[in-house]
Each structure stands twice: as structure tokens, then as C-alpha cells.
Amino acid sequence: MGRFLTTTALALLATGGAATARPIRACDVSTKYLITFGDSYSQTGFDVTGTKPSASNPLGNPLLPGWTASGGLNWVGFLVSEFNTSTTLSYNFAYGGATTNATIVPPYQPTVLSFIDQVAQFSGSIARKPDYAPWNADNALFGVWIGVNDVGNVWWDPNYDSLLEQIMESYFGQLQILYDAGARNFVLLSVPPIQRTPAVLLNNSPENQKAEALAVDKYNEALAANLEAFTDKNGGITAKIVDTGVPFNTALDNPTDYGAPDATCYNSDGKSCLWFNDYHPGIEINRLVAQAVADAWKGSFF
């Protein structure tokens, strides 16, 4: 039986402080691997066939901060450049617009790579632990942050509960593939309070906002329940859920503490408002999310 923990404790959130990272140095035995999957909240534009991550270039391609939807670094970039305590290399398969399974919840374009497609990319590349990415069960942390588009695209559907069961079956089917490839450390990020995005607040009635919030809660409850079953089934796992609602709400409830005039403005500079656009968090919220992940794995990966 594996270890399953849910973490909401964010010791540094009150000040928004960042952990001090050791300088990135040449690859050595302490090198760690952050292997991630998700949607635009996680994407950095990485192409596994391009320049590979290295000690001096932890994202590989594009260079830091990558091609993100935050206006700068997102949570992945922060983890490998500011919260790392040793060389940490990012293999980020996340793709903007992704859903878990495109046959259950279609993405906005058919060319979008779903979580299933992303895991297939992993399986066809670094799953075999090539010389350029010699990850193993101890030095690799697998991160998944998906569900924003799953919930956002179908929260209103009268068959939402049934769809959610199908989504979770697909989600944990992909985790099983990763486990079978040797993954043992998993961090799953919950769906944040998307009902607080400017897009939802401006375009939905209070009743619909409450309904979407309920759909988010149902998703996150299902995520926790399915992870517990997954760790019971598979041995040697350390798995943690990071409740992204905590960093989001911390910033949104205290916008001026994070350099924004209010909780609903957005700006593509990613800095002067909490939101990059009307649906994507800017740099400060991403920093807080990264901090939450780092705190959850303090002493082992960060």
C-alpha cells in the first residue's frame, strides 16, 4: 500500500515569500526530474524532440519562463528555477486546452493533446529512461494538474456525475501507465476555484457560479477518493494532493498584498493583476501554487 496525503498547509503563504534555491549546477547524482502533465495552467511549450533540459536550462525548450499562460513563470518554472534545492529538470508534456479524455470532454480544438495523448508522448520518449533523462522511482516526481477544462466544459451537463466517473477512470488509467513505467512519486493538483475567474464572474449568474463551484468540489472529492483506491491497489507509492484552492483564495482574498488593485482585473504582463487574462492566473498565483507543491515535498524534492 502506498502513502496518500492531502496537503493544504502552506507555511509561507501569508507573506508570499519564496524558498531560496541553490544555484543550478552541472548534472550530478542529486539531479531530480519533474515530469508533468496538464493544460494551459501548466504548459511551457516543451517539445520532447527538441533541446533537452539541462542544469543550465531546466526547461529545455523554450528557455525560461517558457511559453506560458501566466505572463512569465508558471508553477512548473518556479519549481525548477526558484524552489529547487538541487538541479531539477522539467519534462513538461502539458498542452493548452487539454482535457483528460477528448472522447469524454472534447477540447476546444481537435488538435489539442489530451492527458491520454500526453502520457502517450511520455511512453514514446522518456518512459524508457534514456541516457539524457535517467529518471528512476526515487529521483522523479510526476505532477498532474488537469481538470480545469473538464469541469469548465461540462459542469452544466445534467449527466455531470456520470461524466465525472468516466473522467476519473481515464485519469487513473493514465496514472497506472505511469506507475507501470516506474513512477512512484505523484503530486496531483486539484481543480482551483474557477468560479472566481473573471470570465465566470462576468458571464454567469450567481446561481451558475454556485453550480460551477459545486462541480469543482465534486471533482476534487472524486480525485481524492480515486487516489486513495489507486494507492491501495499499487505498492510503493507516495502520492499527495495539493489543494490549489488555498493559494488561489489566499491571493484573491488579499489582492493588494500581491500587487493587484482587486481580485478581478487581468493584464497580459502577468504582474499588475492577479490574472493574466480572464481565465488564467498570473505570476503571483503561480508562485503560490509552486510554493504549495514545494512545501508538500519539502525535504524530499524541494
From Swiss-Prot:
Gene3D superfamilies: SGNH hydrolase. Glycans are attached at N84, N101. It comes from the Eukaryota. Its EC number is 3.1.1.6. It is found in: Secreted. Disulfide bonds: none annotated. One of its GO terms (molecular function) is acetylesterase activity. Pfam families: Lipase_GDSL. Residues 1-21 form the signal peptide. It catalyses: an acetyl ester + H2O = an aliphatic alcohol + acetate + H(+). Keywords: Glycoprotein, Hydrolase, Secreted, Signal. InterPro entries: GDSL, GDSL_lipolytic_enzyme, SGNH_hydro_sf. GO terms for cellular component: extracellular region. Acetyl esterase that acts as an exo-deacetylase. Liberates acetic acid from xylo-oligomers. Belongs to the carbohydrate esterase CE16 family. This is Acetylesterase.
